[in-house]
């Protein structure tokens, strides 16, 4: 059938969801943004300002406004330079594929799964998207700092819950540290240590 743009997009989102025949498609929509805010005395005290970024998506039609019933989202804050004359940066990020299920408990296992296409949005069993998978939440913090012109130290912390719609589900607590040697602008070597505590009854 004709797959020309933009007709196929309108056809997929104006028609009823989950149809059969030549309208049997996996319907997804996403929007993302990045906002750069310059340094403002007393308000944004960071020398290089900061960045706010985010992404929101929905499975099977944007069925409810302003927030779809099957929505998932990611939001973050990035500070490229925390202190004047220093290379310390900071990233704080939160992602949620469980938001729709919490609002509508009957909508479980929506993200990265699909009933007509039983493999879902996956490759070899892994989701083509956020590693927390469906019905999950993820909180992530990372900072890096150059010790020399070619040696960079990094550390991160991660709290994650997967498949929260199940009676018992996996919880992960993770802390990591890494060291990167920039041999050249195109070649780098990295070593690190990660500690994880998994609760998966």
Predicted feature descriptions by range:
Residues 116, 125, 129, 182-184, ...:
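Compositionally biased, low-complexity repeat tracts
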Residues 147-149, 185:
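Short glycine/proline-enriched coil/turn segments at helix->beta-strand junctions
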């Amino acid at each position: 059938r004709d797959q020309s743009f933009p007709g196929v997009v309108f056809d997929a989102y104006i028609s009823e969801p989950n149809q059969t025949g030549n309208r049997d498609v996996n319907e997804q929509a996403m929007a993302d943004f990045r906002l750069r805010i310059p340094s403002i005395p007393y308000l944004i005290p960071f020398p290089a300002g900061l960045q706010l970024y985010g992404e929101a998506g929905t499975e099977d039609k944007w069925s409810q406004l302003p927030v779809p019933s099957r929505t998932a989202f990611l939001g973050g804050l990035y500070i490229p330079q925390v202190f004047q004359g220093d290379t310390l940066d900071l990233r704080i990020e939160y992602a949620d594929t469980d938001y729709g299920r919490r609002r509508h408990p009957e909508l479980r296992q929506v993200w990265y799964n699909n009933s007509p296409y039983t493999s879902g949005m996956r490759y070899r069993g892994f989701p083509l998207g956020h590693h927390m998978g469906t019905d999950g939440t993820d909180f992530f913090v990372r900072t890096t700092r150059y010790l020399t012109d070619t040696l960079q130290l990094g550390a991160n912390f991660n709290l994650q819950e997967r498949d929260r719609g199940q009676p018992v589900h996996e919880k992960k607590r993770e802390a990591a540290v890494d060291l990167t040697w920039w041999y050249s602008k195109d070649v780098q070597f990295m070593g690190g240590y990660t500690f994880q505590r998994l609760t998966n009854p």
